[in-house]
Amino acid sequence: MKREWGLGLLGALGLGFIAVRVNGKLRPKPMPVQIEQFFLTNPLRVSYFGPRDALRLAGNLEGLRVLEIGTGVGVILEEIAKRVGEGGQAFGVDIQSDAVAKTEQRLSQHGLMSRTGLATANALEMPWTDGSMDRVIMVAMLGEIPTSHRVEALKEAGRVLNRDGKLVITEFWPDPHFIALPKMVRLLRQAGFSIVDVYQKPLLYSISAKKEGQVV
């Protein structure tokens, strides 16, 4: 009886995961902040996929201007703000104002707001000037943008990157909006990027890219 109950529970969880994943593919949109906070701060998730993996290909950020698109509740941006140091600046943008508020609260608690700028805006039209960023970071967020606008979002990321800048994208398979690596490579090339490096481990990958014409 217990075995049957356990199998039934696993089956229900499996069906629930499939339903969430299918819905994420058919109706891409930002994850609600309450769910995002649980998902991004969950110790089990952080132990396997945390800021270290997300920023592995970003290089030394000391003194740089680094933008994260889709900050969520600020887990990755907090680490970025620490890494840029007092001589650098971290920036974050999210379309959800409550996510930006959570991020501001998190960074304020760690004394990092003096080196951080936040904005509530669409990833397709960001408030920063052309070539103003050294790095742009996107973590499990491109899939939240409707399919027809993903290349446009990548081009907007390229717009704010300076001539030596680097775009770093990380995807985590359990995320309902996961984009597979081959598809991500195609999207980047369509947006005018060339691939610099790829890091992979089970369930996740990170890819870095530069705008076409840059010396890699």
What role is predicted for each listed range?
Residues 124-136:
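A short acidic, Gly/Pro-enriched loop at the edge of an enzyme's catalytic core
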